[in-house]
């Protein structure tokens, strides 16, 4: 029972986090119907928290708060010389899957096209998942032994939090998301229209997540700036919580060597910086974003809570699972896709083990994400998705012919199956841990859940299925996130534990445990370290090939040139001004202030969300964007300097900022009348910025 006393504080932190997120979701989606005042929303938040607290006290048994994960039991005998054919077979299956995945990524598999091989992989994963579900029938026998350093998770969490705080990895997505928190913090109202390009002048789609608005409400009430709250205060806290969530998730899966597993997982997350969409990049360097916290913390918590509920059948565990689902729903619109899918798998396992009635209770977790998806997001990508569309959006599901008629081209499975395999050795790593992680999850329930999620992942990426999902939900641009159905970090930790416990073996009787332990661990480390790229050097995904970097002390996660430009803008810009600057500066400008507005930080997003008025200005804004950028974007129309004066006038640009070394461009805009307050600010490590206001 040492585990119960040692990690209970972390479990309490997680329970408080889930409670706060659940109340935030309930508050945001209910208050949207009757108020936009941040102070009123804060009051509703307090009332909802009190009511939910009372309900939890009423319907849970004693000890719900901070209740530890029950001591795990093993489905496989850890004895070194016990004949374990299952462990041997899974070991070889993982090795063969890793080789096959790597050959697929290298495009050296014969006969079939890459798309056909991708479809073959999906079929093989589906078949393997069915076998994995059936093989999870081993009898529960031996209690696990947790004689380890019980505060180790706190040390890992502190280290990861430090790295996340010191990593400067600004995000263009903050243009859309942190901007909302900043608007609420500065203006005290929940936005219902555009706040990036105007003071709620342009039409825009309402935000489907509660994460950003509730951070804004908290910032407004506490009088802390939203960027400081999110970039400086929240980052280390959220990163530490995500480590606790991984630890709890692995304990829920009955991973025997959780501390060793945390070491391997943390190393992977620190070196997973090659891919823009990687687990490592989301886990820490982007943790302030709702979708990042969702994949880093809430998915492990949701899976872990579901496994425990399926195993125990206790009311406390069901309520915790439902609370996690509600809290996760408010983080990101991605949750409206994935939470129902996770729930479907958990409900299937619960029904298999405990009957239809228990599965029905489990399915309640779908209600929140389905409601949010229908009422705040819609069922069609071109829909304005405003509130009040719940009825027609629901009726759309009763008209499958209408939805199917919109399908014009099936997605390519090759695009999605290989998307996360960058670097290429990660394809082998992910295939390996899907097998070895199943083995290292020493619980029949956990193995069934893992098998179910793998099966669902394979089904979702079958082209006709994915096409229907994209048509119904309008998520084509983010359907790559169905990869999150596979909890790779948790599976990696379970695989590491399988190595440490002697389950990885070449023969059914593991007579050389130390040798197999060394070789298996070395293989995992090779797949992590050889292609590894520290997340603090990860690419920002931009044309100029900028990368993240370390900074100290921790500060706002903004792009280079921002502080130089803002030093001038704080003096010469007036409230409501439209400012033209380099794209990266506009990204950070829109995230950190709503006093002024950028011209065009998100190029292709602008005409989609600003309505007819915005579309009429689009080409003018593109012209201005091409001029303020030192390097031309080849995907946009080429710059026409003759059209520039008219574009500046029609858009109403009040201030222009240019790189200080662009003498010819500065000279040109001066002829347009941009001379008032002109000055240059240049830091020792920056390009320098020249800004001036139009003389009127």
Map each language-model feature to its residues:
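Membrane-embedded, hydrophobic transmembrane alpha-helices
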Residues: 1-144, 374-385, 390-397, 460, ...
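Hydrophobic, aromatic-rich transmembrane alpha-helices
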Residues: 1-3, 131-134, 250, 347-351, ...
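Membrane-interface alpha helices of multi-pass inner-membrane proteins
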Residues: 26-32, 317-334, 344
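Hydrophobic/aromatic-rich transmembrane helices and adjacent perimembrane loops
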Residues: 114-121, 236, 285, 291-298, ...
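Membrane-interface helix-loop-helix junctions at transmembrane boundaries of multi-pass membrane enzymes
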Residues: 138-146, 252-260, 313-314, 355-361, ...
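Active-site lumenal/periplasmic loops and adjacent helix-entry segments of GT-C-fold
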Residues: 146-147, 156-293, 297, 539-558
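Transmembrane alpha-helical segments
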Residues: 160, 331, 335-337, 516-557
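Short periplasmic/luminal acceptor-recognition loop of GT-C membrane glycosyltransferases, typified by
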Residues: 559-627, 645, 649-666
């Amino acid at each position: 029972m040492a585990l119960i006393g040692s990690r209970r504080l972390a479990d309490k932190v997680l329970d408080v986090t889930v409670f706060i997120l659940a109340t935030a979701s309930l508050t945001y989606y209910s208050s949207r119907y009757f108020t936009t005042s941040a102070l009123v929303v804060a009051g509703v938040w307090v009332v909802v928290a009190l009511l939910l607290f009372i309900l939890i006290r009423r319907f849970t048994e004693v000890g719900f708060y901070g209740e530890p994960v029950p001591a795990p039991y093993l489905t496989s005998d850890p004895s070194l010389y016990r004949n374990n054919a299952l462990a041997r077979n899974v070991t070889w299956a993982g090795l063969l899957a890793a080789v096959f995945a790597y050959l697929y990524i290298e495009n050296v598999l014969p006969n079939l096209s890459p798309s056909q091989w991708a479809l073959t992989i999906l079929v093989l994963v589906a078949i393997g998942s069915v076998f994995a579900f059936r093989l999870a029938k081993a009898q529960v026998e031996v209690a696990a032994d947790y004689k380890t350093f019980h505060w180790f998770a706190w040390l890992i969490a502190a280290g990861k939090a430090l790295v996340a705080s010191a990593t400067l990895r600004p995000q263009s997505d903050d243009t859309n998301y942190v901007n909302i928190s900043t608007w609420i913090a500065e203006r005290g109202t929940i936005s219902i229209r555009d706040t990036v390009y105007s003071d709620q002048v342009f039409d825009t789609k309402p935000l489907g997540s509660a994460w950003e608005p509730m951070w804004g409400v908290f910032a407004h009430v506490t009088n802390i700036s939203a960027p400081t709250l999110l970039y400086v205060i929240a980052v280390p806290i959220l990163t530490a919580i995500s480590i606790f969530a991984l630890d709890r998730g692995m304990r829920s899966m009955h991973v025997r060597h959780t501390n060793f597993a945390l070491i391997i997982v943390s190393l992977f997350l620190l070196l997973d910086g090659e891919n823009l969409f990687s687990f490592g990049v989301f886990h820490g360097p982007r943790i302030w974003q709702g979708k990042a916290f969702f994949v880093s913390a809430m998915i492990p918590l949701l899976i872990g809570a579901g496994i425990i509920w399926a195993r125990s059948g206790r009311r406390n565990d069901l309520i915790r699972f439902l609370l996690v689902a509600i809290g996760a729903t408010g983080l990101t619109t991605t949750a409206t896709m994935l939470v129902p899918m996770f729930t479907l798998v958990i409900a299937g396992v619960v029904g298999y083990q405990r009957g239809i009635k228990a599965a029905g209770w489990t399915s309640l977790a779908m209600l929140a994400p389905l409601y949010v998806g229908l009422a705040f997001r819609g069922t069609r990508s071109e829909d304005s998705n405003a509130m009040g569309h719940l009825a027609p959006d629901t009726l759309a599901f009763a008209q499958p012919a209408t939805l199917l008629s919109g399908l014009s081209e099936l997605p390519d499975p090759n695009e999605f199956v290989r998307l996360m395999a960058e670097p290429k050795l990660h394809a082998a790593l992910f295939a390996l841990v899907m097998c070895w992680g199943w083995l290292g999850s020493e619980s029949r329930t956990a193995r069934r859940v893992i098998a179910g999620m793998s099966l669902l992942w394979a089904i979702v990426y079958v082209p006709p299925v994915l096409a229907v999902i994209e048509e119904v939900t309008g998520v084509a641009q983010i359907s790559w996130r169905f990869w999150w159905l596979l909890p790779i970090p948790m599976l990696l930790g379970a695989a590491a534990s399988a190595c440490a416990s002697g389950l990885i073996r070449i023969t059914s009787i593991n007579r050389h445990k130390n040798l197999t332990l060394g070789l298996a661990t070395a293989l995992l480390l090779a797949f992590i370290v050889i292609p590894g790229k520290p997340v603090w050097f990860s690419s920002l995904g931009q044309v100029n090939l900028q990368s993240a970097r370390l900074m100290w002390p921790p500060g706002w996660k903004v792009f280079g040139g921002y502080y130089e430009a803002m030093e001038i803008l704080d003096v010469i810009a007036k409230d409501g001004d439209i400012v033209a600057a380099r794209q990266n500066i506009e990204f950070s400008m829109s995230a950190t202030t709503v006093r002024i507005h950028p011209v065009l930080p998100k190029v292709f997003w602008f005409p989609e969300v600003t309505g007819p008025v915005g579309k009429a200005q689009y080409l003018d804004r593109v012209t201005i964007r091409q001029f303020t950028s030192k390097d031309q974007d080849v995907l946009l129309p080429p710059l026409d300097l003759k059209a520039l004066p008219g574009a500046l006038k029609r858009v109403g640009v009040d201030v222009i900022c240019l790189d200080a070394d662009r003498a010819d461009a500065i000279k040109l805009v001066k002829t347009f009348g941009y001379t008032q307050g002109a000055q240059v600010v240049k830091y020792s490590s920056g390009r320098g910025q020249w800004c001036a206001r139009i003389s009127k």
